[in-house]
Amino acid sequence: MKHISFLLITLLGGVSVATAASVVAPGAKVEKLAGGMKFTEGPVWLPQQNKVVFSDIPNSKLMQWSEKNGLSEFRKSEQANGNILDLQGRIISCQHAARNIIRIEKDGRAKVLADKFDGKRFNSPNDVAVRHDGTLWFTDPPWGLRGPHEIPGHWVYKLDPATGKVEVLIKDLAMPNGIVFSPDGSRLYVADTGGNKRHPDPAFHKFSASITCYAVTKAGKLGKQLFKIKEGSDGMAVDVKGNLYTTHRNVQVYSTDGKKLQTIEVPEGPANVCFGGKDYKTLFITARTSLYQVRLVHAGAVSLRGKQ
């Protein structure tokens, strides 16, 4: 593999440097779009409205930003975290306080898709990915849990919205967090932020942070582990080339074989990313109190373009 230099983006003085092999567009820099929130997460691009919607978790709000109208409140939430569009263009949202997965219908109603497994309430659903068959794959660590665990672990699930069926996919992660499919759906990336004493099983307390790449069969079954990246992440996204964009201190970019390609420096610690803009070459970054963007070379791999 040929050498790919790291990217350094310096906001002071508006200077940006990108190498010829950079995933960042020539001359592009990380730009702050909005600030003043408490903790931002879960950005999702709404193509028909040309705006990005994202969570402000502690304030229990979904916010929205567009180039035309700037920043405003989109709607109240129950401490929503990760968001994504389903194949019909509806927002799917993971809610900490309500411990559920909801779908925001076209008329604005929020429909609960799932809040339990085997009669026990989820911990606090964190992030969600949609497969091309419409199923929702989501992580359930306890970051928003305010009481005791009902489920004896921090698991990854698959939800069929058509039937309401929920099945467990992964039980052997300490704190599953970000989750995303490869462009063709043949791989699933799941981030684990590592062990701490919130896990009900002490065996998980010393787990290291990581990102695991799993095979996914054509029938939608989880396959074997393909490789593991020895760094964790919060939310993640992939571009059309299959490059993985993670949020560990800054935005880290990995190749399809798990090799680190670049670091995109962000003034605040990022929590999640999504692709958007009319050509899907804008990376929106939620980072602590703010929303940022940077223009990229490759478009994002998203399940929905223009339908909403």
PLM feature segments, named:
Residues 5-16:
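Bacterial N-terminal signal peptides
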Residues 19-308:
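Sequence-structural signature of mature extracellular/luminal beta-sheet repeat domains
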